[in-house]
Each structure stands twice: as C-alpha cells, then as structure tokens.
Amino acid sequence: MRRPPRTGRRDRGQAAIEYLGFLPVLLIVGLAGLQLGIAAYAAQQAGTAARAGARAASSDAEDGPDAQAAATAAVSGWIDPAASTSLGGDEVTVTVTVRIPSVVPFVGDFGTVEKTATMPLPDEEDE
C-alpha cells in the first residue's frame, strides 16, 4: 500500500519568512508617519514662535523681551527658532524659521519651516 505524500511539512516556517520580508516595509512606513508628525509639530511650533515674537515686538513696554527671546521662550527646548523682525508703518512682522528634525536614519536634513505673524503697533496717542 502506498502512502499519500506529505505536503504540510514543506510549508513549515513560511509565515516567519513572510514576516521577515514584510518587516522592513512596516518599519519604513512607521518612520515616515513619525517623520510627518514631527514636521507638522515643527510647523506648529514655528507659528507659535512667530506669534509670540510679534506680540513682544509690538509691545510698548520698556523692559519687554525682544522678538528672538520671546520666540525662543515660546517653543519646546529641542527646537531652535531663528526670528527676523521688520517694521512697516503701524505694524510689526516677525518671521520665524525652524529646522525640521530628522528621525529617519541616514537622512540628514528635511529642510526648514517658516511662519510669519503680524501685529499692530500701539498708537502713540494712547501713551
């Protein structure tokens, strides 16, 4: 009498091989999602810094902070904003540039995010 061939033994370990093949794709997608979230966070922080810098630059307080100090104080400690101020008529505009941090290995730079905020200067009649 003849035995039927055993085909089940050849599939042993197939799931592990498929998992190992899919793991790099899963890691790349996860890192891309994390990097996208960090880029959005950097943009949000740049906007916060621009508004804080414009608010400080439009203040008529004599001992008030300058725009760069206010922008730096308004963001997380691991973000280093660069602020530039321009006066135009009865308003002040502050532009803040923030570098996007990278979490992806072997990729050095994802560029910068730039946000601008404009605030009115106080009227001289109010003094």
Task: Enumerate the language-model features and the residues they cover.
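Alpha-helical assembly-interface signal, strongest on the long, hydrophobic N-terminal helix that forms
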Residues: M1-D66
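Short, conserved structural patches
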Residues: R2-P4, G64-E127
